[in-house]
UniProtKB/Swiss-Prot annotation:
The keyword ATP-binding applies. This is Formate--tetrahydrofolate ligase. Pathway: One-carbon metabolism; tetrahydrofolate interconversion. Gene3D superfamilies: Domain 2, N(10)-formyltetrahydrofolate synthetase, Formyltetrahydrofolate synthetase, domain 3, P-loop containing nucleotide triphosphate hydrolases. Belongs to the formate--tetrahydrofolate ligase family. NCBIfam families: PRK13505.1. The gene is fhs. Its EC number is 6.3.4.3. The keyword Nucleotidyltransferase does not apply. ATP binds at T64, P65, A66, G67, E68, G69, K70, T71. It comes from Dinoroseobacter shibae (strain DSM 16493 / NCIMB 14021 / DFL 12).
Amino acid sequence: MSDIEIARAATKKPIQQIGATLGIGADDLLPYGHDKAKVSQSFITSVQDRPNGKLILVTAINPTPAGEGKTTTTVGLGDGLNRIGKKACVCIREASLGPNFGMKGGAAGGGHAQVIPMEDMNLHFTGDFHAITSAHSLLSAMIDNHIYWGNELEIDIRRVTWRRVVDMNDRALRQITASLGGVANGFPREAGFDITVASEVMAILCLARDLKDLEQRLGDMIVAYRRDRSPVYCRDIKAEGAMTVLLKDAMQPNLVQTLENNPAFVHGGPFANIAHGCNSVIATTTALKLADFVVTEAGFGADLGAEKFMNIKCRKAGLAPDCVVLVATVRAMKMNGGVAKADLGAENVAAVQAGCANLGRHIGNLQGFGVPVVVAINHFVTDTEAEIQAVKDYVAGQGAEAILSRHWELGSEGSAALATRVAEIAESGASQFSPLYPDAMPLLEKIETIAKRIYHAEKVIADNKIVDQLKLWEEQGYGHLPICMAKTQYSFSTDPNERGAPTGHAIPVREVRLSAGAGFVVVVCGEIMTMPGLPRVPSAEHIRLNDAGEVEGLF
């Protein structure tokens, strides 16, 4: 059966029953239909003094066209922990509309390790992304309105940095001219659109602790500069209060369920390159108060998502992972070993061994954070015993252990062995987590630390303009902020075609951006796309309603 057929065949429980497994009463759930609900802010506040459960991060090797199955493993591990008698909850991100109608498929997991209701989660869900788009757009409108009515703040209209957003892949909107059509429409200027998940509002929603913190962070956003290059903040436009009103419901995490009726929080969805690529702090911290084990994931490979989880999310939220699960597949090892995608079905132990260097690099990087690492081999039907053993032997040589997991095929039955070992490690107290760099380290040195320790680069190339900008931000009081690297997810270098574990390369910094509200400095390496385009044949062409009123073609 396909993923959607498996999801539709599942027996869903009313969301009130799912909430009850975590101790959330019906009065503290704000239902959206029968199978999804938001958890009230008052309930979240009421559990803040409880002790935390164990935090498990699921990450992966650099993504390949063969697919690694990170979300599938996250869901499968959560179900597996519940199967062996642990009270566990899954925390993942929401899906963006744009990619769902572009490249084929949304989905949250796959096979027998999915979160449902699948269609809702990949379409409008509970309206969080619409609220974020609306709040962002309100600020855009208020900036141009301020300029129209006299520009008291003396905004330099050539230096308005706040772009507009829409939750769609639309390359035609990347660079536009706004306010054409005469005096009544304002002052013409260059502008552009990003996709909603690239918005700083999204990053802020996912890092804010509560509504008060949200409003403070929104006010801190830099939206433009004056002629003297001094910043204009969102609070100068007086937009943060109304934006908070638009976001008050979106701040409440969404509760749904897995195919095996276990609880899952699905909340927030920032880009893993331009932002930090993790689900919301409020969902993760709430889950930790309600469950003994919380399984969460971070976007793309461990060099991007896990690094940001450790250095941004954990630092901001005071979190510390008890175990990291690194997802790898035999197919991906073969691809890293030089096998073409069409030939991945044939046994090739030598290619598996050759392709393990990328896996080894990630293991070493993660161990550098002081956290125990378990490799989950996400099983595919074409994997042979010899190939699986080759991965296990390699991982053992790296001071870690690899466990085969068959959750896609068998659900929690297939992930029970992985869950048992992860639980043992998490409960052992072996984790000695520490971030990669201290707050007090200068910004450029933080960038160099990530480049050398995580990417194994020889040097960072940054011109005087960038170095001076970083020094200026330090003088303005932003030197304590963590770094958010924006680079290709496909390689440790900035060349997406450079597979494996390259060393000795340089990391060129093209641009630096201050996300003062979110609280990090974005370092752009190479080309970064904040508004994707649709492919030649977008998946939207194949999406329709069938005669039964069911969605077809979405996954």
